[in-house]
């Protein structure tokens, strides 16, 4: 998993990784992307922060080191008996809006790629720090704030129950997928050693054909993408890089 870092010197306290007991899921609550949010929090004292931001395309940006205490779920009063900034990691999901931007609006929604990467990141952090699934909670569960809005009202295709089920699945009991799989109206390519789909990256087939996969792991077609050589390449209707 690629994690881009744009760390802020502000808006956090020093800590150690043995403090981590909870993972708190948020939504940004505005229309900015992950990198833009990291830049904002790195630009001065904001009175708030989070460890990670997950973008619309599934890319992940880190603003605060895991060991340090971000200011993401502090409040004067709490609903949760234990979870606080001092013992948690905060993950912010970038969010779209189709109408009203009020906190209580049902017009907020997540992109598929955002949710897929947030699940992957959460599972990675759970495994790394020994955080059980019942310690992955919403900002709403900590303070009562309507955050993350789509996971409080559960009015879209992406629900909190679905998210919890995805992070709770036992990877040892799941049959690892490998190679090309037709899913969700498109194609994914699963790496045999991990059972994870290629995301936000190129893949070369044995015949020398190159493909690009988005943040949800879906093969991209009829679009231009840049490669590591800095050049732009066109992906045909079959997803293959057009070389001539």
Tell what function each PLM region has.
Residues 39, 102-107, 196-199:
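Short, polar loop/linker segments at the starts of domains and inter-domain junctions
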Residues 172-244:
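Extracellular adhesion/carbohydrate-binding repeat motifs centered on closely spaced tryptophans
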Residues 22, 86-88, 210:
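Structural motif
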Residues 2-5, 12, 16-17, 82, ...:
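Basic/polar, cationic surfaces and motifs that engage anionic cell-wall
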Residues 29-32, 58, 96-98, 131, ...:
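Acidic glycine-/aspartate-rich tracts in secreted/extracellular proteins
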Residues 1-84:
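N-terminal catalytic cores of peptidoglycan-degrading enzymes
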Residues 18-19, 86, 131, 198, ...:
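Structured loop/turn residues at beta-strand edges in well-structured enzyme cores
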């Amino acid at each position: 998993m690629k994690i881009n870092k744009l760390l802020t010197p502000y808006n956090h306290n020093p800590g150690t990784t043995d403090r981590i007991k909870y993972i708190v899921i948020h939504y940004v609550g505005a229309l900015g992307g992950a990198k833009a949010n990291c830049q904002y929090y790195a630009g001065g004292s904001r009175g708030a922060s989070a460890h990670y931001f997950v973008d619309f395309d599934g890319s992940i940006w880190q603003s605060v080191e895991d060991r340090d205490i971000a200011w993401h779920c502090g409040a004067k009063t709490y609903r949760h008996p234990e979870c606080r900034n001092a013992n948690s990691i905060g993950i912010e999901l970038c969010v779209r809006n189709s109408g009203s931007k009020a906190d209580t609006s049902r017009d907020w929604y997540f992109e598929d790629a955002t949710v897929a990467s947030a699940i992957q990141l959460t599972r990675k952090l759970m495994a790394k720090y020994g955080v059980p699934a019942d310690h992955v909670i919403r900002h709403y569960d900590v303070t009562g704030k309507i955050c993350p809005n789509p996971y409080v009202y559960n009015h879209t295709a992406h629900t909190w129950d679905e998210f919890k089920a995805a992070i709770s699945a036992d990877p040892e009991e799941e049959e690892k997928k490998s190679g090309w799989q037709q899913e969700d109206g498109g194609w994914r390519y699963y790496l045999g050693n991990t059972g994870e789909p290629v995301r936000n990256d190129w893949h070369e087939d044995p015949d020398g054909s190159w493909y690009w996969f988005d943040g949800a792991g879906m093969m991209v077609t009829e679009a231009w993408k840049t490669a590591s050589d800095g050049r732009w390449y066109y992906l045909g209707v079959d997803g293959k890089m057009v070389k001539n």
